[in-house]
UniProtKB/Swiss-Prot annotation:
This is Glutamate-1-semialdehyde 2,1-aminomutase. Pfam families: Aminotran_3. Gene3D superfamilies: Aspartate Aminotransferase, domain 1, Type I PLP-dependent aspartate aminotransferase-like (Major domain). GO terms for biological process: protoporphyrinogen IX biosynthetic process. Its EC number is 5.4.3.8. The modification N6-(pyridoxal phosphate)lysine is found at K265. Its main location: cytoplasm. It comes from Salmonella arizonae (strain ATCC BAA-731 / CDC346-86 / RSK2980). It is an enzyme of class 5 (isomerase). Keywords: Cytoplasm, Isomerase, Porphyrin biosynthesis, Pyridoxal phosphate. Homodimer. Belongs to the class-III pyridoxal-phosphate-dependent aminotransferase family. HemL subfamily. It catalyses: (S)-4-amino-5-oxopentanoate = 5-aminolevulinate.
């Protein structure tokens, strides 16, 4: 047995499923998950000594690549002064100044410890501010594991939320309306059915948890208009897209102004950080200035703030996003060309430093139903053959891939060459 296999066997006796987050278990592709020893730049190294070009990037945070010296040094320096104080620090102020300067729609920001905390808190704030209970989310979009967000759609375009996980009471989920991503008619139907009850829409501007599905041109502006028409708040969940699709996020790239924004992943530079913020009048409703309660023992802790501050300063440097776009575009185009040469029907969506691979002859993938119609079995074979070639992709047909500026053009071309060999075997 390999060392990864031995560790996985031991882990399953002690940790549910052997992992601390389900997708890491390779359930979506089969086989034994890799146990990682270290990472540097664009590369992962497993406990068995094998090296991989990494397109997971810790599920998004590693836009600068692994083990970036500026982030590493910032963490070491901060740790020498203490790990956590439970009191305000100067770095929290500096971090808030930086985040609000980079994302102009955020007048104020509150730091938390994860993307789930950010979305959960933003929804509570929207409900408290509007005095309404219902929320709209979209089929196939994931906003963390808060109870009100673990719901799925039924057969219709609009359904009252039904729990998608045991342990979530139906009474919690009943206020969540699920609409169809990229379908404004389903959203209008929800508002017309509950015109005075909907507090907010929460949306991934690029749906990165059903692989990578881009918004149609009219979709995000249409959501803004509907929120304005019916007095609801628009929450854009930029946990995945923030600082990756563009410096000011996908909201800037697509030209839509939210009331609240949720951030995570890149904002922590690899440390556990989330944030939510937006309009001053809305944020003023948050405790201690307002009645909506939110708190956290480790929120804004000095180690995480130091890592995030160092990361965002690097991400804000000129040319970073141009490089990211160039690398991602080259990979997407190369994969399409290689698949076409092999007669493999393939769609590759991409924007900024995100991409998604879909085995389908549909020609385009724009919603959850399109994603579900793709050939998952072929993706499983593709994943394992690419892994054999030394390329680590997301171990699920429903997760986006992530580029970093640490990837070289040689890394990209080698990945395309590997895919060409793999396509010949599919």
């Amino acid at each position: 047995m390999s060392k990864s296999e031995n560790l996985y066997s031991a882990a399953r006796e002690l940790i549910p499923g052997g992992v601390n987050s389900p997708v890491r278990a390779f359930t979506g592709v089969g086989g034994t998950p890799l146990f990682i020893e270290k990472a540097d730049g664009a590369w992962l190294y497993d406990v068995d000594g094998k090296a991989y070009i990494d397109y997971v990037g810790s599920w998004g945070p590693m836009v600068l690549g692994h083990n970036h010296p500026a982030i590493r040094n910032a963490v070491i320096e901060a740790a020498e002064r203490g790990l956590s104080f439970g009191a305000p620090t100067e770095m929290e102020v500096k971090m808030a100044e930086l985040v609000t300067s980079l994302v102009p729609t955020m007048d104020m920001v509150r730091m938390v410890n994860s993307g789930t905390e950010a979305t959960m808190s933003a929804i509570r704030l929207a409900r408290g501010f509007t005095g309404r209970d219902k929320i709209i989310k979209f089929e196939g979009c994931y906003h963390g594991h808060a109870d009100c967000l673990l719901v799925k759609a039924g057969s219709g375009a609009l359904t009252l939320g039904q729990p998608n996980s045991p342990g979530v009471p139906a009474d919690f989920a009943k206020h969540t309306l699920t609409c169809v991503y990229n379908d404004l008619a389903s959203v209008r139907a929800a508002f017309e059915q509950y015109p005075q009850e909907i507090a907010c829409i929460i949306v991934e501007p690029v749906a990165g948890n059903m692989n990578c599905v881009l918004p149609l041109p009219e979709f995000l502006p249409g959501l803004r208009a509907l929120c304005d028409e019916f007095g609801a708040l628009l929450i854009i969940d930029e946990v995945m897209t923030g600082f990756r699709v563009a410096l000011a996020g996908a909201q800037d790239y697509y030209g839509v102004v939210p009331d609240l924004t949720c951030l995570g992943k890149i904002i922590g530079g690899g440390m556990p950080v989330g944030a939510f913020g937006g309009r001053r009048d809305v944020m003023d409703a948050l405790a201690p200035t307002g009645p909506v309660y939110q708190a956290g023992t480790l929120s804004g802790n000095p180690i995480a703030m130091a890592a995030g501050f160092a990361c965002l300063n690097e991400v804000a440097q000129p040319g970073i996003h141009e490089t990211l776009n160039k690398l991602t575009t080259r990979l997407a185009e190369g994969l399409r060309e290689a698949a076409q040469e092999a007669g493999i029907p393939l769609v590759v969506n991409h924007v900024g430093g995100m991409f998604g691979i879909f085995f389908t002859d549909a020609g385009s993938v724009t919603c959850y139903q399109d994603v579900m119609a793709c050939d998952v079995e072929r993706f499983k074979r593709f994943f394992h053959l690419m892994l054999d070639e030394g390329v680590y992709l997301a171990p699920s047909a429903f997760e986006a891939g992530f580029m970093s500026v640490a990837h070289s053009m040689d890394d990209i071309n080698n990945t395309i060459d590997a895919a060409r060999r793999v396509f010949a075997k599919l």
